[in-house]
């Protein structure tokens, strides 16, 4: 299924959870923190400004992004995969290689 979020919303696939610490300790699923990184899989058309103009989003499909621990509280299931839906303003940064 193909998604097209509305306005300034972004759909993100969360990165895989870290199940091992830097010291090599394996964490059980309940102790592992949900990652706050992901890949943008769909973007809306942009934010509608007060004057009616549409400001395009600064992120694009394929961008690796960092977001807050409480961002993306809206999850949807698409083709068996959990995806996050959040506003562009909930994204802190784009990870550049």
From Swiss-Prot:
Cell compartment(s), UniProt: Cytoplasm
Gene Ontology molecular function: any one: protein-folding chaperone binding
Classification via InterPro entries: Chaperonin_GroES (IPR020818), Chaperonin_GroES_sf (IPR037124), Chaprnonin_Cpn10_CS (IPR018369), GroES-like_sf (IPR011032)
Assembly, per entry: Heptamer of 7 subunits arranged in a ring. Interacts with the chaperonin GroEL.
GO biological process: chaperone cofactor-dependent protein refolding
Signal peptide positions (record): none
Provenance organism: Azotobacter vinelandii (strain DJ / ATCC BAA-1303)
GO cellular component, one term: cytoplasm
Gene this chain is encoded by: groES
Homology family: Belongs to the GroES chaperonin family.
PANTHER family per UniProt: 10 KDA HEAT SHOCK PROTEIN, CO-CHAPERONIN GROES
Source species taxonomy: Bacteria, Pseudomonadati, Pseudomonadota, Gammaproteobacteria, Pseudomonadales
Protein purpose: Together with the chaperonin GroEL, plays an essential role in assisting protein folding. The GroEL-GroES system forms a nano-cage that allows encapsulation of the non-native substrate proteins and provides a physical environment optimized to promote and accelerate protein folding. GroES binds to the apical surface of the GroEL ring, thereby capping the opening of the GroEL channel.
NCBIfam families from the UniProt entry: PRK00364.1-1, PRK00364.1-2, PRK00364.2-2, PRK00364.2-4
Protein name according to UniProt: Co-chaperonin GroES
Secreted recorded as keyword: no
